[in-house]
C-alpha cells in the first residue's frame, strides 16, 4: 500500500512540475504577444537604411587622382586602378577603375582613406545577379547613383516604427 501512495505522490509532483513549465513557457509567449512584428513584406516594403550603412560604392571619376590608396588599404587588394603617367605635366591620368562586388567585403576602408573623397558608400544593397561577372563594376557603373529608397514611389518605406509603451 505504501509504494502505491508514494507513486501517486510522485505522479502528482511531476504533474505540478510539468504544469509549471508549461505555464512558464506560456508566460514567455504572452510577453511577446504585444510586440510589433519584425518581418516586412520585402519587395513592397523596405526599411530605410542608416547613415552608416555600407552598401554599393559610388565612384566619381573626375575627382580620382589615381593615387591607389584604396588598393593599398583594401584587405583583399580589390579595386583595379589603371593609369598612365602624363610626362608633360608629371601627373597620373586615370584610365580605368573597377571593383568586383562579388569579392568585395564592404569594409569601407577605401572610402575612409580616399584623400579626394571620390568614393562613397550608397544605400544600395540589391546587387544579386544570375551571372557573377555582372558584379564587376567599371567606372561607368560605379558612377551611377542608385535610386533612393525614400524617393521610390512604388515602395512603402518603414522608417519610424511606433514604440509600445510599457506602463
Swiss-Prot record:
A Gene Ontology term for the protein's cellular component: chloroplast thylakoid membrane
EC primary class: translocase
Describe cofactor binding as the record notes it: Binds 2 [4Fe-4S] clusters per subunit.
Q: Where does [4Fe-4S] cluster 2 bind?
A: 74, 104, 107, 110
Q: Which UniProt keywords apply?
A: 4Fe-4S, Chloroplast, Iron, Iron-sulfur, Membrane, Metal-binding, NAD, NADP, Plastid, Plastoquinone, Quinone, Repeat, Thylakoid, Translocase
Q: Any idea which positions bind [4Fe-4S] cluster 1?
A: 64, 67, 70, 114
Per its Swiss-Prot or TrEMBL entry, what cofactor is needed?
[4Fe-4S] cluster
How does this protein sit in the membrane?
Peripheral membrane protein
Which Gene Ontology BP annotations are present?
A: photosynthesis, light reaction
Q: Look up the EC number in the record and give it.
A: 7.1.1.-
User: Catalyses which reaction?
Assistant: a plastoquinone + NADH + (n+1) H(+)(in) = a plastoquinol + NAD(+) + n H(+)(out); a plastoquinone + NADPH + (n+1) H(+)(in) = a plastoquinol + NADP(+) + n H(+)(out)
The superkingdom listed in its UniProt entry is Eukaryota
Q: Where is the 4Fe-4S ferredoxin-type domain?
A: 55-84, 95-124
Sample GO molecular function, one term: iron ion binding
Subcellular location, in the record's words?
Plastid, Chloroplast thylakoid membrane
Give the matching Pfam families: Fer4 (PF00037)
Q: How does it assemble?
A: NDH is composed of at least 16 different subunits, 5 of which are encoded in the nucleus.
| Free-text function comment from the UniProt entry | NDH shuttles electrons from NAD(P)H:plastoquinone, via FMN and iron-sulfur (Fe-S) centers, to quinones in the photosynthetic chain and possibly in a chloroplast respiratory chain. The immediate electron acceptor for the enzyme in this species is believed to be plastoquinone. Couples the redox reaction to proton translocation, and thus conserves the redox energy in a proton gradient.
State the family it belongs to.
Answer: Belongs to the complex I 23 kDa subunit family.
* Protein name (record): NAD(P)H-quinone oxidoreductase subunit I, chloroplastic
Q: Which organism is it from?
A: Nicotiana tabacum
